[in-house]
C-alpha cells in the first residue's frame, strides 16, 4: 500500500504483519539466550530489511505491555528479555515465520553478538 509507513524499507520476503514481528522478537530473544538492547534488536531486524523500524518499535512496545517481554537493567542500559509467556509464544509460533527470515535474523544476531564481544574485550585507552 503506498504511504503505509509500516512497510517502508521492508525487503521482499520481510515481515509486514505486526503479529509476525512480535513472534520474530520473541524468537530472537529465545534463540540468542540473553537479553538484548533496543539498539541490538533493531539492528538485527533492520539489517536485511526484515521489518520496518516503526512496526518493530510498535511490536516491542506491545510485547512489553502484554507481558511477553521484560526490561532488565545492565548498568545504564535497558535490555529486553523474554518472560515465560514470550518463550512459550516463540516455541508455539516460530514456524509461522518464513525459514529465510529466521535464518537471516539468527545469522545477523550471531555476527552482532560476536562484534559486541570483540569490542568489549579489546578496549583501547589513549593517554
Region roles according to the model:
Residues 34-45:
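Short acidic, hydrophobic short linear motifs in intrinsically disordered regions
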Residues 18, 74-96:
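Short, cationic-aromatic polyanion-contact patches
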Residues 1-32:
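Short alpha-helical segments that sit at the start of domains
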Residues 50-65:
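Short amphipathic alpha-helical interaction segments
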Residues 64-74:
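A short, conserved structural fragment
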Residues 103-127:
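Exposed, interaction-prone assembly regions rather than primary DNA-binding/catalytic cores
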Residues 88-103, 109, 113:
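Winged-helix/helix-turn-helix nucleic-acid-interaction surface
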Amino acid at each position: 500500500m503506498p504511504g503505509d509507513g509500516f512497510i517502508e524499507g521492508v525487503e521482499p520476503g520481510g515481515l509486514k504483519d505486526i503479529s509476525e514481528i512480535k513472534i520474530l522478537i520473541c524468537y530472537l530473544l529465545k534463540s540468542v539466550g540473553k537479553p538484548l538492547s533496543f539498539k541490538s534488536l533493531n539492528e538485527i531486524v533492520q539489517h536485511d530489511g526484515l521489518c520496518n523500524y516503526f512496526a518493530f518499535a510498535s511490536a516491542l512496545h506491545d510485547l512489553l505491555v502484554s507481558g511477553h517481554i521484560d526490561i532488565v537493567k545492565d548498568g545504564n542500559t535497558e535490555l529486553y528479555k523474554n518472560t515465560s509467556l514470550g518463550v512459550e509464544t516463540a516455541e508455539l509460533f516460530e514456524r509461522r515465520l518464513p525459514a529465510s527470515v529466521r535464518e537471516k535474523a539468527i545469522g545477523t544476531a550471531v555476527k552482532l553478538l560476536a562484534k559486541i564481544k570483540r569490542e568489549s574485550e579489546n578496549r583501547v585507552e589513549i593517554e
